[in-house]
Amino acid sequence: MKERVITAILLIGSVLGAPPVLSAQGPNPRGETALGEGEVIVEYGRPSTRGRDMISMMRPGSYWRLGADTNTVLESEVPLLLGDTTVPAGSHILLAHLAEPGQWELVVCKSVGDNFTPQETLATVPLTFEEGHPHVELLTLNLEGSGESAMLVITWGAYRLTASFSTD
């Protein structure tokens, strides 16, 4: 009995005296859809606008990794057709490129490393850019559609960017 009391006191003391454990945030959010004979997934970090208008702060010619803290990754079990370009199955980085004010492009890169260079571009397709949507505080990337074609829908703040793709 005495041993149980001592064990309980030591256990309670160690818990009360232990530094707080901060849990890591869960996995990055994902957009996913079945396409053709496989699945397509987009995984990204999810920044908040916090009162900022980040999209309007971008300069023409700049690239945006479409997320926070890490690259946005497209994983596909099937080859994809973006515009006239076939992107092989596998993992790739997604970026948005502001070619000029109001003119956006979706860029798919070979690498999933940290640094992007234009030489790694596999495909570039126009993004449809729309303003005036209801405010979305947290960046959201969704894959809408199934069967043979789908659309990547990016919403953040009052903006919406979209690009269509299909199985090859």
Task: Locate the predicted segments by residue.
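Positively charged n-region of N-terminal signal peptides that target proteins for export
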Residues: M1-R4
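Bacterial N-terminal signal peptides
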Residues: T7-A18
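Primarily secretory-pathway and cell-envelope proteins
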Residues: L22-S62, L98, G113-D168
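Mid-length scaffold segments of soluble, non-membrane domains
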Residues: R65-V112
